[in-house]
Amino acid sequence: MRTSQYLLSTLKETPADAEVVSHKLMLRAGMIRKLASGLYNWMPTGIRVLKKVEKIVREEMNNTGAIEISMPVVQPADLWQESGRWEQYGPELLRFVDRGDRPFVLGPTHEEVITDLIRNEVSSYKQLPLTLFQIQTKFRDEVRPRFGVMRSREFLMKDAYSFHATQTSLQETYDNMYEAYSKIFTRIGLDFRAVLADTGSIGGSASHEFQVLAASGEDDIVFSTESNYAANIELAEAVAPAHDRAVPTEDMHLVDTPNAKTIAELVEQFNLPIEKTVKTLMVHAAEGTSHKLIALLVRGDHELNEIKAEKLSLVASPLTFATEEEIRSIVGAGPGSLGPVNLPIPAIIDRSVAVMSDFGAGANINDKHYFGINWERDLPVPEVADIRNVVEGDASPDGKGTLLIKRGIEVGHIFQLGTKYSDAMKATVQGEDGHNQIVTMGCYGIGVTRIVAAAIEQNHDDRGIIWPDAIAPFQVAILPMNMHKSYRVKEVAEKLYADLRASGIDVIFDDRKERPGVMFADMELIGVPHTVVIGDRNLDNGEVEYKHRRNDEKQMLKLDNVVDYLKQQLGC
């Protein structure tokens, strides 16, 4: 590609509304242009990267034996009503009616459509296992789109769905997909972790996320210092403390605390160690229980894990915090004065709270706290559960090492759906025994557009993007110095351009009448990994200058060795 025939569209300045590095650089490098909130035009440079990501994803899906199909973005609402997700999904699901007043949605995912397809096309266990995939546009009406294509409303996704007669068959495909995803992200050149994850609105049982490590990530991922254990913080187990509860050293006593409405204020005003405090959170109780609210207690320096709490049998799902009015009507005190002593509703305490002694908590009387509380002596131990987020330094759940926490960008997610959708939508096949059985399902997603942003978050410097070779928009840039004044430079550049193209190398030839500084800046900004600089002075010695974008290494290459050297660098 010649720059004179290309829409390069680079920018010197960063647009004011760009927040994270990938958003800034994708705009400056001319990869995307904003059309509306969460909607982007993909420009030529961006599309080149996107297509290379797609190619790798498609190749590895084909290697698993998955079969490519394409399903509509527009989906009938009755399929979503049939699966039960019409009400569950919420406002992210864009709903509309056609001219015949028939309701439809813009698909944020395709479980319903694929299940409908399979129940009409597959009738026998002999046709299973079967895995189908597509690379298709999705739409989620995000309440606050941000970070460019990292959290946009419209995005490109690879979604695969597998269908099985047995759980054993599903597990085999799930394991194969796990390996395929690992190969995809390794080939692309990402530093990633596969972590245990919650199934969320998709549903199902087992689930793994593939997280790219990046400071701008929205997820906290947890992994051990001494083993392969890794999990999303939502799912990471906070193991019970190894030590027993200490012997009480003080009596429980009531303290006036009119200006201490938060744990931070209590700690500051009364010189309490924060690990000697307990915070009490009120949530709605599950239907069928004898109480309207449930109290959840965690240590003052810990945070409630809402995903864990929501899975407790006494807690309503989705988790809903009580209003101040609800709390006052039942407890008789405001949110800043709640605690376990004389509490008129059931309580569930975290494992770390169960081993506390001589601790402070609200007295369930406005502007008062009890200090010196001890379990069993002052009140019975309530139900104990793991309901907090882990923190760095916690013991790893597998007993090996301690936990580290890093930020991550989710680029892939695999699920064992089981029969959630096939049962709801009556997708059955005739089994070996001649009777109909519900099909068992798995689903496997990759955020193709998000991969592009995640790769930039991991690969950039103050001059621009540093693409891994596998997904660079161009593998090699040819920069001829003063080509329009030197016939020799032009002749060498043209020949090298032709030779590289003939070798199947993706090359951009900067044939503009521009200053060298502009040419270098643009190629560094868009992240071309390998640059060849051609100038009269070096040609006197039969050489050109080679520069590697990632390490800034420069070296002189003989003209007759340039193509072979670049092919070696690129692994061609």
From Swiss-Prot:
Cellular-component GO terms for this entry: cytosol
Instruction: Give the UniProt subcellular location, in the record's own words.
Output: Cytoplasm
- Any one Pfam family match given in the protein's UniProt record, by short name: tRNA_edit
Class of this enzyme = ligase
Listed A to Z, the keywords are: Aminoacyl-tRNA synthetase, ATP-binding, Cytoplasm, Ligase, Nucleotide-binding, Protein biosynthesis
Q: Which reaction does it catalyse?
A: tRNA(Pro) + L-proline + ATP = L-prolyl-tRNA(Pro) + AMP + diphosphate
Q: Which InterPro entries match?
A: aa-tRNA-synt_IIb, aa-tRNA-synth_II, aa-tRNA-synth_II/BPL/LPL, Anticodon-bd, Anticodon-bd_dom_sf, Pro-tRNA-ligase_IIa, Pro-tRNA-synth_IIa_bac-type, Pro-tRNA-Synthase_IIa_type1
**Entry note about domains:** Consists of three domains: the N-terminal catalytic domain, the editing domain and the C-terminal anticodon-binding domain.
Subunit details for this protein?
Answer: Homodimer.
Q: What is stated as this protein's family in its record?
A: Belongs to the class-II aminoacyl-tRNA synthetase family. ProS type 1 subfamily.
**Which PANTHER family does UniProt cross-reference here?**
MITOCHONDRIAL RIBOSOME PROTEIN L39/PROLYL-TRNA LIGASE FAMILY MEMBER, PROLINE--TRNA LIGASE
Function comment = Catalyzes the attachment of proline to tRNA(Pro) in a two-step reaction: proline is first activated by ATP to form Pro-AMP and then transferred to the acceptor end of tRNA(Pro). As ProRS can inadvertently accommodate and process non-cognate amino acids such as alanine and cysteine, to avoid such errors it has two additional distinct editing activities against alanine. One activity is designated as 'pretransfer' editing and involves the tRNA(Pro)-independent hydrolysis of activated Ala-AMP.
The family database entries (HAMAP family) matched by this protein are listed as:
Pro_tRNA_synth_type1
UniProt protein name: Proline--tRNA ligase
Protein source organism: Photorhabdus laumondii subsp. laumondii (strain DSM 15139 / CIP 105565 / TT01) (Photorhabdus luminescens subsp. laumondii)
